[in-house]
Amino acid sequence: LISFARSLVKTDGVSYDAVMSMAINLDNQFNLPADYGSLDSRWNRNQVGPFIKLLKKFVKDSRFDAFYHSNENLYQEAVSRFMPIYKSIDTQWYNDFYGQKSNDRFHIILSMSNGPGNYGPSVTDKENVHNVFSVMGAWVTDSVGMVVYPPELILPILIHEFNHSFINFDPEMFRTSGEQIYAAVGEQMARQAYGQWSIV
């Protein structure tokens, strides 16, 4: 799986938010829905099946389920520390600000394995509900190494990540200008996890 995933980075640019796109589309058995049109376009459709097969094998071989459950106290502590921020988020603001009446469902994923990476993917489910996500990394810790979520740092990032679901669009209409701009600033943007023109 690891070698295959690395090859997808090199051949198709499957990295950053493309990985999160796969994660939110998978069900609890690591299956994709029959129609996975919301999967990031960097996922080559010919590679999705082999990736899922290898992922399931990895989950089984690594005894991931046992690992996950052995760390439940850690996850619960992270959730407890995040709750003040969770309680301060006003999801109605997005509808008011963007002028949309919608049945969006908001989800926060605390991903302590992401380090400082944060993402804002979305998926529309079979009931036509738009599920918007803020996948929050963990990079600030206390004196014993436990994650902390300083509101003044984390809340603006959380809001930013949810915004992606309301403003992302098909970038192809801006390909020419996007490629020109990225040629000039690509090196600096890549250091900020924007590895190609279409995600800037």
Sequence positions of predicted segments:
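Non-catalytic architectural context of zinc metalloproteases
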Residues: L1-P84
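Post-HExxH zinc-binding segment in Zn-dependent metallohydrolases
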Residues: L1-S21, D27, F169-V200
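Active-site scaffold of zinc-dependent metalloenzymes
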Residues: G37, G120-E152
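Auxiliary, metal-adjacent structural segments of Zn-dependent hydrolase domains
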Residues: N71-V132
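Second-shell loop/turn segments in exported
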Residues: Q76-P84, S143-V148, A193-W197
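Beta-strand/loop-rich accessory regions of lumenal/periplasmic or secreted enzymes
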Residues: M112-G115, V147, N163
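Active-site recognition of the HExxH zinc-binding catalytic motif
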Residues: E152-T176
